A protein has these predicted regions:
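Residue-level signal for inorganic ion chemistry
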Residues: 36, 72, 94, 116, ...
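Hydrophobic face of amphipathic alpha-helices that form TPR/SEL1-like repeat modules
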Residues: 1-34
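A short hydrophobic/small-residue beta-strand
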Residues: 176-178, 354, 437
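Rossmann-like NAD(P) dinucleotide-binding subdomain of oxidoreductase/dehydrogenase enzymes
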Residues: 84, 128-272, 397
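Short, well-ordered beta-strand elements within core beta-sheets of diverse protein domains
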Residues: 38-45, 59-66, 152, 262-265, ...
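Conserved C-terminal structural/oligomerization subdomain of aldehyde/semialdehyde dehydrogenase
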Residues: 35-41, 226, 263, 317-318, ...
Length: 485
């Protein structure tokens, strides 16, 4: 590991401007998924440490909320610049703890920085309103104010960019934050604390702690000082957080599970569709909430698409993310590999055909072969369950109506993709799909300028776009009377 990378690898929690260990002295091991070897530890904090972090954020909020939008924007721009200045070392740290390729890690750091820059600008545009009054002697104002202390819980698959989507709008709006990164990838989260310190954020504005998820989550949900929870993760955990936080009626933003369909119509550009499919399926080894879970291909091009997708999948280079040219790293852990194996076994027992892959990779550990399964049917678990691995099941359909029905046959509604050369069909299908995000002839659609988020059981709220900062603001109505007008 590079010396500078070690500077950002903080094996302590940041609470009120101090780097501290857990009260109990207990730690959690952090392993490199590519090697299985321990790379360090982080504190195993609990309720008491979480409470102190929340109190520190609450105290810091008193002054932070009074800073101007311009002052906050300047600090966020410095944070953006610091991230880009250290892009290579932050990417290396991310790859070491998460496993994805350095190419993807650099892209994630760049994306995270882009979100910070976007919200540095959006924070200056949280406009209020002057409403025409129905009374001649009164005036009506509508203002926007920061909600207060927010708690952000982030996942292991994109440990830097997911935090950027939450910290960026929160800090821009004038909120303070308590952050809990995933225990599998804590260093990318803790690195934000080091960066925030270095660019001059006041103590207590950003607090980051690792530890027992249940204890930290319970304190966040129950503590009345926390005004909002923002979470990216499983639908199961999201529902639990909503339920527990309802006692104190907190605002919540939830970016939860997905079951993304990728539809290919007969009139599609097949080469373009395959290129998009590789991106939409295999980014981060299939471990993304918006990655394709089900390929739905029209009968007329089914065989051609399967053949080309299989060839492209088989050509992907698998290996340690630190190696040059690697496109597929390991899965996050053994449990993830076992889940993929279960889903493949279920598919083959129900008539599915493994075209390429289907097994653990010769590299061992949690490496898995990019896999394409033909003759997939709705009876297979793929239809309802999120794979979170490098497996591409391909279903066949006959009509446009059937494709839309199959795509919508899920409780999830995060992202979806489809390829067609017919403009009229593009609008019909786009309007018929019950998803928060739709890629038309594109397999990679995420950008800070657009609102990211789902419908149905895929979540609540939006991250990115001008909508992204609204969840961190309260709207206040002010009626001014006695003006003697």
């Amino acid at each position: 590991m590079l010396q500078k990378t070690s500077h950002f690898m903080r094996q302590a929690n940041l609470i009120n401007g101090e780097w501290v260990q857990a009260d109990s002295g207990q730690t959690i091991d952090v392993n490199n998924p590519a090697t299985g070897l321990k790379i360090g530890t982080v504190p195993k904090a609990g309720k008491a440490e979480t409470r102190r972090a929340i109190e520190a954020a609450g105290e810091a909020f008193k002054s932070w909320r009074k800073t101007t939008a311009l002052e906050r924007s300047k600090l966020l721009r410095k944070l953006h610049d610091a991230m880009m200045d250290n892009q290579d070392v932050l990417a290396e740290l991310l790859t070491i703890e998460q496993g994805k390729s350095l190419f993807e890690s650099k892209g994630e750091i760049g994306s995270a920085a882009a979100y910070i820059l976007w919200f540095a600008e959006e924070g200056r545009r949280t406009y209020g309103d002057i409403v025409p009054s129905p009374w001649g002697d009164r005036r009506i104002l509508v203002t926007k104010e920061p909600v207060g202390v927010i708690a952000a819980i982030t996942p292991w698959n994109f440990p830097s960019s997911m935090l950027a989507r939450k910290l960026g709008p929160a800090l821009a709006a004038g909120c303070t934050a308590v952050v809990k990164p995933a225990t599998q990838t804590p260093y990318s989260g803790l690195a934000w604390g080091a960066l925030a310190e270095e660019v001059g954020f006041p103590k207590g504005v950003v607090n980051i702690l690792t530890g027992a998820a249940g204890e930290i989550g319970d304190e966040i949900c129950a503590n009345p000082l926390v005004s909002k929870i923002t979470f990216t993760g499983s639908t199961e955990v999201g529902k639990l957080l909503i339920q527990k936080s309802s006692v104190t009626v907190k605002k919540v933003s939830m970016e939860l599970g997905g079951n993304a369909p990728f539809i290919v119509f007969d009139d599609a550009d097949i080469d373009r569709a395959v290129t998009g499919a590789i991106t939409a399926k295999y980014r981060n080894s299939g471990q993304t909430c918006v990655c394709t879970n089900r390929f739905l291909v029209q009968a007329g091009v089914y065989d051609k698409f399967v053949e080309r997708l299989a060839a492209a999948s088989n050509a992907l280079k698998v290996g340690s993310g630190l190696e040059e040219g690697v496109q597929q790293g390991p899965l996050i852990d053994e449990k993830a590999v076992e889940k993929v194996e279960e889903l493949i076994a279920d598919a083959t027992s129900k008539g599915g055909k493994v075209v390429v892959g289907g097994k653990r990779h010769a590299l061992g550990g949690s490496f898995f072969q990019p896999t394409v399964i033909a003759d997939a049917t709705p009876k297979m678990r793929f239809m309802k369950e999120e794979i979170f691995g490098p497996v591409a099941p391909v279903f066949k359909f006959e009509t446009e109506e059937q494709a839309i029905a199959l795509a919508n046959d899920t409780e999830f509604g995060l992202a979806c993709y489809f390829y067609t050369g017919d403009l009229g069909r593009a609008f019909r299908v786009m309007e018929g799909l019950k998803y928060g995000m739709v890629g038309v002839n594109e397999g990679l659609i995420t950008t800070p300028e657009a609102p990211f988020g789902g419908v149905k059981e895929s979540g609540l709220g939006k991250e990115g776009g001008h909508q992204g900062i609204e969840d961190y603001l309260d709207t206040k109505y002010v009626c001014i009377g006695g003006l003697g007008l």
